[in-house]
Design a protein with these regions (language model features):
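Glycine-rich ATP phosphate-binding loop
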Residues: 63-83
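Non-catalytic scaffold residues of the protein kinase domain
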Residues: 101-104, 168
Length: 336
């Protein structure tokens, strides 16, 4: 009986490989014009044993996928198993594309012997995942130190800039949010999850497609027009900046189309102080102004991500001196 069961499993795995592998190859060729990073192929048996092992533990999950910790050939890996077809192909193709950049978790390989591709990443067991308040741990945990939050914003901005500028066809992430940011054991921020990402046609700056993303992080203009551009990511990143600054979930920052945030830096500082959080008023004012510019679609002056990343680097260099606040103008520029 065991022989026939194993034979049936292998037959099913072979059938899945032909179907899943064909779709994966089609997506890969369409995305990268024949140029991609080589990744390892894992077998059905390897994934099955790794995820059935008693030592296997679930790292994190959502309604669309589940993360597992598994051991293959004596080495620990993080295994991502999807439930949605298009999302799985998107994630494996684009994760392979950016795998050598330090701003993203490293994709080691995949398995095509399941109905949907199974992604195998480097071991993420030591990684921490930001919660919806931009912190780590339980929801009421203290905020991370301000310099750490600022560093996270900078590193995520650099990763998004890479997506927007490194390839002939711009990659739009479309699901930038706190919960899609991992921190490695050295505190380095890594942006994850390409399940909703789209790649713009070469030479095009936008496409029309069904809107998708996470409530609280989605630009209302994008919902109305269904036009996706790099500014779709800029808006979502602006919300992430506000989450990191204020420590409140993205879904609570906008209510009925209106901002639900402190109207100026003084209110923001007061709010943080009342919650027992340390503050750096000068850097925080510059950071708040930049975040609001990212979210200000109506002005027509939203900055590109490369500009945002550079400005955050400059904010990092501003002296931590609260007495300088009087030298910061209303538009966020430092005066002398």
């Amino acid at each position: 009986m065991e022989f026939w069961r194993r034979r049936k499993e292998k037959g099913k795995a072979r059938e899945c490989f032909l179907k899943t592998g064909s779709m994966f190859l089609k997506k890969l060729i369409a995305d990268c014009n024949g140029i991609s990073n080589p990744i390892r192929m894992f077998s059905f048996d390897q994934i099955s044993k790794a995820t059935d092992d008693p030592r296997c533990s679930i790292l994190d999950g959502s309604s669309d996928f589940t993360w597992y910790k598994g051991v293959i050939e004596g080495k620990p890996y993080s295994i991502k198993i999807y439930r949605m077809e298009e999302m799985a192909y998107n994630d494996v193709v684009l994760s392979a594309r950016v795998s050598n950049h330090s701003g993203f978790p490293k994709l080691i390989g995949c398995c095509l012997e399941y109905p949907l591709p199974v992604l195998v990443f480097e071991d993420l067991d030591d990684y921490k995942i930001l919660n919806e308040r931009g912190s780590v741990g339980c929801e009421d945990a203290p905020l991370l130190p301000w310099n750490v939050r600022l560093k996270i914003a900078k590193e995520v901005a650099i990763a998004i800039t890479y997506l927007h500028t490194a390839f002939p066809r711009i990659i739009i992430h479309r699901n930038i949010k706190a919960e899609n940011v991992f921190l490695d054991k050295n505190g380095k921020a890594k942006l994850t999850d390409f399940s909703l990402a789209v790649t713009l046609p070469e030479g095009k700056s936008w496409i029309e497609t069904k809107w998708s993303g996470t409530c609280g992080y989605i630009d209302s203009g994008y919902v109305l027009t269904v036009l996706v551009s790099e500014y779709t990511d800029v808006f979502s990143f602006g919300i992430l900046m506000l989450v990191l600054l204020i420590g409140r979930p993205g879904g609570l920052l906008i209510s009925d189309g209106r901002w639900n945030i402190p109207s100026n830096i003084s209110e923001c500082v007061k709010d943080l102080q009342e919650r027992g959080e340390p503050v750096e008023p000068v850097q925080m004012k510059l950071f708040l102004d930049l975040a609001l510019r990212c979210c200000d679609r109506s002005s027509g002056y939203q900055p590109k991500m490369i500009v945002v990343a550079k400005e955050i680097m400059l904010i990092e260099k501003v002296p931590l001196d609260s007495q300088m606040l009087e030298n910061v103008s209303e538009d966020g520029q430092i005066t002398h």
